[in-house]
Amino acid sequence: VRIGLIQQNYLVGDLSGNREKIFRAVAEAPAGVDLFVTSELALQGYPPRDLLLYHRFVERSLEAVETLAQKLTGFAPLLLGGVEFGSAPKRLHNCAFLLHQGKVVQRFRKTLLPNYDIFDERRYFEPGQGAQSFLLDGQKIGVTICEDVWAGSPEVPFYDLNPVGELRGVDLMVNLSASPFVRGKQAKREMVLGDAARALGVPTFYANQVGGTDHLVFDGSSFALDGTGALLGRAKAFAEDLLVVDPDLAPQRIEPKLGSEEEVWRALVLGVKDYAAKCGFKTAVLGLSGGIDSALTAVIAAQALGADQVTGLLLPSPYSSPGSVADSLALAQAYGIKTTTLPIGPMMVAMDLALAPSFEGLPNDVTEENLQARIRGNLLMAFSNKFGSLLLTTGNKSELSVGYCTLYGDMSGGLAVISDLYKTEVYRLCHWLNQTQGGKIPEAILTKAPSAELRPGQTDQDSLPDYDTLDAVLHHLIEERKSAAETAAQGFDLPLVERINQLLSRAEFKRQQAAPGIKVSTQAFGGGWRMPIAASKTLF
């Protein structure tokens, strides 16, 4: 049995467009494929979120299934990811439809519904009653959907039921998946599916979605394993593909597994590219400060959209160093990004004069510093509005964690490109770009001390610990969900950890007003981080 794994980039909610895309993949495939398999919820695009709460959307989804089945008359069978109504009007099933000879031949319902991190499937779906199978050319094929194969994994120790165990006796297993990218995820997928293949002793096929959807990026990398868990084939990463594998033959096309920095780079580029395209933007604008964060964001945008579609605004104040302007211009010239320079000194004076009667007798403090950031935010938004460009924010995860950012200032924008990269990860990715990818980020940007330049001689370490320490502590508090005491036990000073933990808690109100950011870590801010705002600021 030759299996064709359809790996496509879908637009969420575009039922007719996604349907036609799937049809073309089948119609244009090479001859000899016995079964085609899409990713999970391919017809709707994953995740459809609260579109699923609209009865008419589900009705139209089912109509699209019937239409596709009819159009595929004469082609090989297709396992299609979609939804169907459940036991009650507002309960649904996440399912796979087997389409053949113009009809829906069989339905397979997802059993395990993830309800952690960015997954919220119990909000919409009710579980199926265990894994199922069907016969094709005398072969018994087991069907699972994404989470169904993760029950035995230490990654998700939540389930008593293991659908894979119910498939003993099948000749092969397929898994329709929509698994978002995080750093190192592909190795875990191949390990988990390898365990399933060995448990059943049969070839196992995994079809994944590809492309950016809001804050998520799906990396594709669909694959097939033999009954020992050895790789038979792997599709491209971060690109559409059709992987055709015959489990009776020797290993076939195996696309290379990407290194840690390259996979993050490609995830961020695809995330920006698809977010812009799917939201209707062709151009982007961002502030260029001469620092490493805006440099990396600009380089990602240039790669994603084309350098000629990116505008960098230089917004120097009286506190900006000459090097900041020069370094920004050098970066822009190296990458072909057009720039506009708008000094904000006159606007700072106007603001100070307007506020002087109210602030008389009070010393300057962070208020005046934040006014500079908000002046810049207004100018950036003006360019975004006037030219219809997507405004990219340039803050990193370290800053967003501890609130070292200004609401309605540098946080203004439509997409927070590097908000899931700690500062140390920003440096590492930039060095990787320059050393291995022919990157042209000026050395001065890589070596200067980080600074917001909101007062004379300011550096980030006036307010924060060194980034090596800060990021290590934050990783324990955020990704590993450790308490302050547990984190300090890893070799950190307890008062320092408690201070960082308090900053993390106090900044929650900022994070919940931040632009969506592209998830690349196991614990990003956004949909998978659900912390209270009006709560004790020393939670643990």
Regions of interest found by a model, annotated:
Residues 202, 227, 253-290, 294-540:
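ATP/NTP-dependent adenylation/nucleotidyl-transfer catalytic domains that generate, transfer
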